[in-house]
């Protein structure tokens, strides 16, 4: 894959129902440690130590979810930056260890502030390397790869309803009405151990990466997401349109969307 420049954009919105935004996201150059500002559009070469695209969707009363998401995101970013080039040599192991460290960081926050007991967060961390993409996932935030006009899920929801759908007990169209639709099988910070699911794929010129909270995929269909990514070549505009789709669907939850376009050859057409 060429390395002419990576175009990345992130945006987060409280939605139309919730009072607080308990989502947190990070887009960070793991070589310099620099983080993009909210709603930023960043054109950069893929850093030699990788680029981190991270979404955490916190849960817990009295704004504790916001704290859990922030603590986890900062812990993961800091650990990966501190590891430096070791991340590129062992990306899966580095991501897994970073998520485990975030789990301990959130639990330490609860020890220091017992009133926050029960808080936790989802975590979907995508590590973009010059030739590959490595994703670690806990909970029901998601990562997708858009390639050749196809939206490919890179994560599986770690939730009760997802498990019921996979086992054939629940129809996909009935998920949104199920009383356990928000119950996760695991989250960062809620138990002594966490086991992130790790996925690694080779990247190609022109690939588009999407990382999002369930505030997007919970109310916007995969077909609508794919159509938006197909019809909107500009990364910043695609990011805004995906957030707008969630708001037009009622904005029932906080929504966070990160989109990155991999470098493509001058002669390559966008999928």
PLM ranges: what are they?
Residues 1-271:
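PP2C/PPM-type serine/threonine phosphatase catalytic domain
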């Amino acid at each position: 894959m060429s390395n002419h420049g990576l175009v990345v954009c992130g945006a987060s919105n409280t939605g139309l129902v919730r009072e607080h935004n308990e989502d947190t996201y990070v887009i960070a150059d793991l070589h310099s440690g620099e983080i993009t500002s909210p709603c930023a559009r960043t054109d950069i070469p893929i850093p030699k130590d990788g680029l981190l695209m991270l979404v955490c969707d916190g849960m817990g009363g009295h704004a504790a979810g916001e704290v859990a998401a922030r603590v986890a995101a900062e812990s993961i970013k800091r650990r990966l930056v501190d590891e430096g080039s070791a991340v590129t040599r062992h990306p899966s192991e580095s991501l897994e260890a970073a998520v485990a460290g975030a789990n301990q960081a959130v639990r330490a926050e609860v020890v220091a502030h017992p009133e926050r007991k029960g808080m936790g967060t989802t975590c979907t961390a995508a590590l973009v390397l010059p030739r590959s993409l490595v994703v670690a996932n806990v909970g029901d935030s998601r990562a997708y790869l858009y390639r050749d006009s196809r939206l490919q899920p890179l994560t599986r929801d770690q939730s009760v309803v997802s498990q019921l759908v996979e086992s054939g007990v629940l129809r996909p169209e009935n998920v949104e009405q199920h009383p356990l639709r928000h119950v996760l099988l695991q989250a960062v910070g809620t138990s002594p151990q966490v086991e992130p699911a790790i996925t690694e794929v080779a990247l190609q010129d022109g690939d588009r990466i999407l990382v999002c909270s369930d505030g997007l995929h919970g109310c916007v269909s995969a077909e609508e997401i794919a159509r938006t990514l197909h019809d909107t070549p500009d990364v910043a505009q695609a990011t805004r349109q995906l957030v707008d789709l969630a708001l037009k669907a009622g904005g029932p939850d906080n929504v966070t969307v990160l989109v990155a376009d991999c470098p493509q050859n001058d002669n390559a057409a966008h999928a």
